[in-house]
């Protein structure tokens, strides 16, 4: 180990898209000879990649910056909260530099200034797939930046700009390198996966001798040829999403859709500037399940949005009862500085938000428990995430890492992370499954 090599620490907060930004920064720095330090003490400089979407996220970011300052003292701040440099420097005036999201060159330049690189031309420093912060067997694949929507509760377009898609060939090249490096599952992410390629007018780029359109359907079809799991996140419910379902039924991509519906009351959806045809959405969900019976549907919702009445909330509960989504997250509405929703009338009291959140989660818990119980006695493919002396923990095709449920295989210690195995489901609760290897004597 070259003792003269500079070491960089990183703290990555927020969503998987921010994690990919952190990976890109580290890949660039590693290529220049920097080592990645797992501790504050060992690092010559620390990068804090912040989240600035909610006030609670900003508070967490400021706390993380403060910890890095206390433990190391040489801190570069980037990410979504980096757009509010005044707030950061007011709380932590000693930070070395502050940059906004996706400003990789400025982050790298700040690192160069704080800890000039020591080059070693004889070392192959970076693996072909780049530096990743996830386990070896799965990786996030970011296909675009920014968003063209004007949802009133959100400031992502202000933080990350308008939609900017990557050419299909570049996405597929990265995906292929990840697969060759041993990644067994790709999680496709963006702010709006369905809108991929709109800014490029769905232009074609060459891939293995054939043109591939920068469009979600064609991209998914090409990713499906890699022979690994491909999971779609942040899918806005455009009509052409229906084209993806046959690919799931054919086994090209995982039968999993993460669609942020946000609410079911037409009045609230209109106030949010979201699609408001939830009756048609129920019909689409029924069609999807007819074409691909194994499809798992995940979504997120907001309760307590300004103007939400008890009747609006009941419409949401009734819709949930009909939709029977498999995996659901729910957030109590929180005002975001700069969001248009802040100007809306009829704010919902905090105690009402809390009460509705508990009612929502209780209702969804019953749905989840019922749907998971239907899997008992069936054999399901699972990917293994962890193995210890007690057994293995994995996930089904219907479960994404970190946000969905787990599958526990007690006593199965011979497996390894990344293994994909058939599992006989023996027990289920509201969120998780238990089972054993199928066909085992």
Curated annotation (Swiss-Prot):
Its EC number is 2.8.4.4. One of its GO terms (biological process) is tRNA modification. [4Fe-4S] cluster 1 binds at residues 15, 51, 80. Residues 6-116 form the MTTase N-terminal domain. Residues 133-370 form the Radical SAM core domain. PROSITE patterns: MTTASE_N (PS51449), MTTASE_RADICAL (PS01278), RADICAL_SAM (PS51918), TRAM (PS50926). One of its GO terms (molecular function) is metal ion binding. Residues 373-439 form the TRAM domain. Keywords: 4Fe-4S, Cytoplasm, Iron, Iron-sulfur, Metal-binding, S-adenosyl-L-methionine, Transferase. It is found in: Cytoplasm. Binds 2 [4Fe-4S] clusters. One cluster is coordinated with 3 cysteines and an exchangeable S-adenosyl-L-methionine. Catalyzes the methylthiolation of an aspartic acid residue of ribosomal protein uS12. This is Ribosomal protein uS12 methylthiotransferase RimO.
């Amino acid at each position: 180990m070259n003792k003269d090599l500079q070491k960089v620490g990183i703290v990555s907060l927020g969503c998987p898209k921010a994690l990919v930004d952190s990976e890109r920064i580290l890949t660039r720095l590693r290529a220049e000879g920097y080592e990645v330090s797992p501790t504050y003490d060992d690092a010559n400089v620390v990068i804090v990649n912040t989240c600035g979407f909610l006030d609670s996220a900003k508070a967490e970011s400021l706390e993380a910056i403060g910890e890095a300052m206390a433990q190391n003292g040489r801190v570069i701040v980037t990410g979504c909260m980096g757009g509010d440099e005044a707030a950061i420097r007011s709380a932590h005036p000693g930070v070395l530099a502050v940059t906004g999201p996706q400003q990789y060159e400025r982050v790298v330049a700040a690192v160069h200034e704080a800890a000039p690189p020591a080059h070693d031309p004889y070392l192959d420093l970076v693996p072909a797939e780049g530096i990743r912060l996830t386990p070896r067997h799965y990786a996030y694949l970011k296909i675009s930046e920014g968003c063209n929507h004007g949802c009133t509760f959100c400031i992502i377009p202000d933080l990350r700009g308008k939609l900017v898609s990557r050419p299909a060939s570049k996405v597929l090249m990265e995906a292929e390198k990840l697969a060759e490096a041993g990644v067994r599952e790709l999680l496709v992410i963006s702010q709006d996966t369905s809108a991929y390629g709109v800014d490029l007018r769905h232009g074609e780029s060459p891939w293995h001798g054939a043109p591939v359109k920068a469009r979600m359907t064609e991209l998914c079809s090409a990713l499906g040829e890699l022979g690994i799991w491909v999971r779609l996140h942040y899918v806005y419910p455009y009509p052409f999403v229906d084209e993806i379902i046959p690919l799931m039924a054919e086994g090209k991509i995982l039968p999993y859709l993460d669609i942020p519906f946000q609410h079911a009351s037409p009045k609230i959806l209109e106030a949010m500037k979201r699609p408001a045809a939830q009756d048609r959405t129920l019909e689409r969900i029924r069609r999807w399940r007819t074409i691909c019976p194994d499809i798992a549907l995940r979504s997120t919702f907001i309760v307590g949005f300004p103007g939400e009445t008890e009747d609006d909330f009941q419409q949401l509960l009734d819709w949930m009862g009909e939709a029977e989504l498999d995996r659901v997250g729910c957030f109590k509405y929180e005002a975001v500085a700069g969001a248009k929703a802040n100007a809306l009338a009829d704010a919902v009291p905090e105690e009402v938000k809390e009460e509705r959140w508990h009612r929502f989660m209780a209702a969804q818990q019953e749905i989840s428990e019922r749907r998971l119980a239907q899997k008992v006695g069936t054999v399901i493919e699972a990917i293994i995430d962890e193995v210890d002396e007690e057994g293995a923990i994995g996930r089904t095709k219907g479960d994404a890492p970190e946000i969905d449920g787990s599958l526990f295989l007690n006593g199965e210690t011979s497996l390894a992370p990344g293994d994909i195995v058939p599992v006989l489901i023996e027990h289920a609760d509201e969120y998780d499954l238990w089972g054993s290897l199928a066909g085992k004597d």
